[in-house]
Each structure stands twice: as structure tokens, then as C-alpha cells.
Amino acid sequence: FPELKTKYIDTGKARYILREFPFDPSAEAGFMLARCSKDNYFAMVDVLFKQQPSWVGVNNTKEALLQVSKLAGFTQESFESCLTDQKLLDDVRAVQKRGADEFKVDSTPTFFINGKTYKGAMSIEEMSAIIDPLL
């Protein structure tokens, strides 16, 4: 993402919109924590993506997420408060549902570039091959 941001977003050539699409409770928790970060939403999402191996698929996801969240300034109390906010969970799930229902998203990552759908991770070279002809 940093290369994509530098090459296209920061230069105004493209817009990037992140839509939350969690497939499991740990991903839901991650996006909830990002939302609780308020003005630091994207910084928290970035940390969560970079630290994914430390909290996805581990024995104690909640404890692992707490450790990652503490790096972002969460306390035990703010962490618990965030993850027990039912309205927040409902809001995250609503975004996921809309993606599935309206845009037929069924995997992550999924990219929409000029109305076309691309599924799966892509290198900056693969993204550039799609984006550059559209500029």
C-alpha cells in the first residue's frame, strides 16, 4: 500500500477507499479497534495489517490484539470498552453486508478499479498495469 499511496493517491491520480470486510470475529475486532482509534483510524489499520501474523490465527487473539492496541495507546479499559460496543460491531457488520450484497465481494482483498473487480493480492506492478492505462 505505501507504494500505491505514493504513486497514485498522494499525487491525486487516484482515490483509495477502504471498506471493511471482516470474515471472522478477529477481523471484526481489528476493525472495531481501528474505529475506536478515531483520528488515527488509518494508522491503526496499517499497524493491524503489518502485525497480522502476531494476532491472526493465534491461540489467544484477544490478548494478542490487546498488545498491538497498546502500541496505539489503548489501555485495558479502552480496549475492553471498544470490543464490547454492540453498536460498533453492528456498524462494522453492516459495511461487510453491503459489500457482499451490493458489490458481490466474497474475498479479501478485493479491488474495484474504474468499475471492474479484481480479487486477490496484487503487487504494485500488477496494480500499475491496470491503473496506468486509465490515467
Predicted regions and their residues:
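C-terminal cap of thioredoxin/glutaredoxin-like
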Residues: 1, 5-6, 66-135
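Structural alpha/beta surface segment adjacent to cysteine/selenocysteine redox centers
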Residues: 1-70
